[in-house]
């Protein structure tokens, strides 16, 4: 079934209109998509892509344009950058990829700006010691590195991972590599006590628990109460 672009734009607009300090874009996206019963799987994916393209390329957009036009412009910029990243001058990327206040606090390098504008990889966290078997089961995946990093897999296949048996069986979680590194750096041991002071929706806490073999005490807290309620 063809993707209905007008429908995608309408839903993406609802997400952006709903997003605020108390409802970050990822939460607003989940809430709106939960309410949308008539979208195809492809339209769900395209809506997510449109929302995050809008925020990723916000520094290039004209705020006086109607929101649907801004979203379309962001999608066009995203496609150009994917195909020809060198067509964006380094000084332009450094200037527009982050808000002005960021440049007052830290140096914005071309490498960082390029990374911010690139589509993120999809990272999975396998159960401890199960990275190799999960990679064989999924196919189209590769480990982040040797040793402990072998349980962190970058997935580049077409499957909806939330629907496959391995996910439903709890064999892996979807978790960004930087978040996985937190647990590996902590390297908790079974029987220890740890406090996750920025628990969010629990991904890092679950990783700590897995590394502790579910033996010990784990406290979790977060400034955003709604994240803990999830």
Q: What are these regions, as identified by a protein language model?
A:
Residues 1-230:
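S-adenosylmethionine
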